[in-house]
Regions:
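Rhodanese-like catalytic fold shared by cysteine-dependent sulfurtransferases
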Residues: 2-18, 22-25, 33-64, 71-112
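N-terminal glycine-rich beta->alpha transition that marks the start or flank
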Residues: 29
């Protein structure tokens, strides 16, 4: 068991696969808008950690499957906690984009 797994941070690659298989699922990037614009996982929505109360503008169903990620897993752990407090029960912290092995979108990947 790795350090991040021990701390409750999920495996982002396995988490993305689970997200793709899930119905009524949302992938939420809790990093800042600037970080999100630089790079993000396709299909994700940006909802910064300091705006968790804005989740209702993205996810109306409190029983939906919500997968949260950040850079390394720390902010997404806090986001999971805050979303649980707001009544969203099916929230998974899938860890950090730094460990993601898939395709990313964002400014970093466009020719200038």
């Amino acid at each position: 068991m790795g350090l991040f797994s021990f701390l409750g941070f999920g495996n982002i690659n396995a988490g993305i696969e689970e997200f793709k298989r899930s119905k009524n699922a949302y992938l939420i990037d809790v990093r800042t808008p600037m970080e999100y614009k630089e790079e993000h996982i396709p299909g994700s929505k940006n909802l910064p950690l300091d705006n968790m109360k804005g989740i209702s503008s993205i996810v109306k169903d409190k029983n939906a499957n919500i997968f949260v990620y950040c850079l390394s897993g720390g902010r997404s752990a806090e986001a999971k906690h805050r979303l649980n407090q707001l009544g969203y029960e099916n929230v998974k912290n899938i860890g950090g984009i730094a460990s993601y092995k898939g395709i990313l979108e964002g400014r970093r990947y466009h020719a200038s």
